[in-house]
């Protein structure tokens, strides 16, 4: 069945007809995304699905008597001036001051984090790290091969990745296991941009990425991309591994990147 996730009555009717034991919310509109200069513009449709779409699915689950609702979250969109250590956990505050061009995107991500565990009797948010794999991040790979993704400002920002089939496995596990709440679904090897980007270029058989200062990066790519490359924080998967009993097939992006690019 194909329907509009923003059509409340259609969503409610479809879920009631299916009468599922679990509702899994994976609605996004990210296909073809290429530029993050203005995240609020790039993610406008996805922001709607994360807010109105989430409300529609929660209402549908209530009407259908479905207690367990699992929603896709995101571990990666951080503040412009993050505090604390190198790694974040589910216990860290959800509220932070976002980049000016990403206010709506950040609010939509936070909305899912707060609303699903609160409104659903068994509400779970799986905050995926940076997804990669065949058909998921091919745009990035193409850009890296063309040397269109530079290391900005020293590449000191820390990222957490998750291979697409590992994310799917965690989601399947959460269908039957795990207390309500938030889980960070990332691999076990958070890494600085200055580590993972040159490695991806090497695996892809490309020349090393260019390096540009932060001021030039702001002109070329925008403030959000500069923040991601210089001040972002990684995430810990300890809770997901312990409470869901989930283990990533690719505990490091290094082996995952190799399998993705060469497979």
Ranges and model annotations:
Residues 34-102:
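Conserved Rossmann-fold NAD(P)-dependent oxidoreductase catalytic core, especially the SDR/UDP-sugar
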């Amino acid at each position: 069945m194909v329907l509009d996730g923003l059509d409340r009555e259609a969503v409610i009717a479809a879920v009631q007809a299916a009468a599922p034991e679990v509702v899994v919310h994976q609605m996004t509109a990210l296909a073809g995304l290429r530029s993050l200069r203005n995240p609020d513009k790039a993610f406008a449709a996805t922001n709607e699905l994360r807010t109105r779409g989430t409300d529609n699915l929660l209402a549908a689950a209530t009407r259908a008597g479905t207690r367990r609702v699992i929603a896709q979250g995101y571990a990666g969109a951080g503040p412009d001036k993050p505090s604390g250590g190198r790694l974040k956990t589910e216990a860290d505050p959800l509220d932070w001051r976002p980049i000016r061009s990403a206010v709506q995107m950040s609010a939509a991500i936070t909305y899912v984090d707060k609303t699903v565990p609160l409104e659903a009797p068994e509400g779970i948010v799986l905050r995926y790290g940076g997804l990669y794999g065949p058909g998921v991040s091919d745009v990035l790979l193409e850009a890296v091969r063309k040397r269109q993704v530079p290391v900005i400002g020293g590449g000191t920002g820390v990222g957490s990745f998750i291979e697409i089939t590992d994310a799917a496995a965690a989601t399947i596990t959460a269908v039957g296991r795990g207390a309500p709440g938030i889980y960070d679904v990332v691999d076990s090897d958070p890494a600085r941009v200055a580590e993972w980007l040159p490695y991806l270029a090497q695996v892809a058989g490309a020349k090393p990425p260019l390096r540009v200062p932060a001021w030039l990066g702001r002109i070329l790519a925008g403030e959000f991309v500069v923040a991601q490359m210089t001040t972002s924080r990684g995430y810990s998967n300890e809770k997901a591994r312990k409470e869901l009993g989930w283990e990533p097939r690719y505990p490091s992006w290094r082996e995952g990147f190799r399998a993705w690019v060469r497979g």
